[in-house]
UniProtKB/Swiss-Prot annotation:
Residues that bind Zn(2+) 3: E74, H102, H132
Cofactors demanded by this protein: Zn(2+)
Protein's UniProt name: Probable phosphatase VIBHAR_04983
Species: Vibrio campbellii (strain ATCC BAA-1116)
InterPro entries: Phosphatase_YcdX_put, PHP_dom, PHP_phosphatase, Pol/His_phosphatase_N, Pol/histidinol_Pase-like
Family, similarity comment: Belongs to the PHP family.
HAMAP family recorded: YcdX_phosphat
Residues that coordinate or bind Zn(2+) 1: H8, H10, E74, D194
Length: 250
């Protein structure tokens, strides 16, 4: 499947990544992307920036190297109440919010606890996508959570770094299960490289292979085109980004 948007990338600001936004944009162009989301870790992760970093993304250009830039964050799931570690005052300056479990922030518990947290994250209305759900340390009820995500128009990320098999070990088979259940339920999928170095921005080959193998229709993959991604943001109630009118109307 052709994928023209990468919705999960990091810069050196995350504390354990190694490239600048400009370097990421250059790689995005070289790798054939039309658009990518810059989504550094929110502040509860060790080494991550203060929330001002995300609020100030309003100064970023809408295009770098001819590639559209979406202003985002990978927030942390903080508790079972559905809280993330970004103040609500920052929301107006962001286009895209991922929420993910990370072991340094949320101590792994049992499936019921993780399921409750994910359901409340979905229902809080602030989160556009759930990140790298395959992690076996954070088991959850796939069908219940994915059904809720469908009902609330929250995208399910398939993460290319996870599919390499050396990060969040034990996730690969679970990602296939999530993709199959998501396909059957009709969820929206998004695709992220989870790049921590610029050369990986736009590297979505394993995700593409998985989606083809499972038989997911491109109409349910919001990153199949930049137009589909922007349409999904509007479906979620986000204000259209004027600088992308030409993309939207292409």
């Amino acid at each position: 499947m052709e994928l023209k948007v990468d919705t999960h990338t990091h810069t050196y600001a995350s504390g354990h990544a190694y490239s600048t936004l400009i370097e990421n944009a250059k790689s995005a162009k070289e790798n054939g992307l039309d658009m990518f989301c810059t989504t550094d870790h929110a502040e509860s992760m060790p080494g991550a920036p203060h929330y001002w970093f995300f609020s100030n993304q309003k100064i970023l250009p809408r295009f770098l190297e001819g590639v559209a830039i979406i202003r985002g964050v990978e927030s942390n799931i903080m508790n079972t109440q559905g809280d993330i570690d970004i103040p609500e005052s920052v929301d107006r300056n962001l286009d895209w919010v991922i929420a993910s479990f990370h072991e340094p922030v949320f101590r792994p518990a049992d499936s019921a606890t993780h399921t409750e947290a994910l359901l409340n994250i979905i229902k809080n209305g602030r989160v556009d996508a759930l990140g790298h759900l395959g992690n076996p340390n954070f088991d959850f009820d796939f069908e219940v959570v994915l059904k809720c995500a469908k009902e609330h128009y929250v995208a399910i990320e398939i993460n290319n770094t996870t599919l390499k098999g050396n990060s969040r070990v034990g996730s690969v088979d679970r990602c296939h299960q999530i993709a199959q259940i998501g396909k059957d339920l009709g969820v929206f999928f998004t695709t992220g490289s989870d790049a921590h170095f610029c050369h990986d921005v736009g590297n979505l080959s394993l995700v593409s292979e998985l989606m083809d193998r499972v038989g997911i229709d491109s109409s349910k993959v919001i990153t199949h085109s930049a137009q589909q991604f922007l349409a999904f943001l509007e479906l979620r109630g986000r204000k259209p980004i004027a600088e992308y009118d030409e993309i939207r109307n292409a």
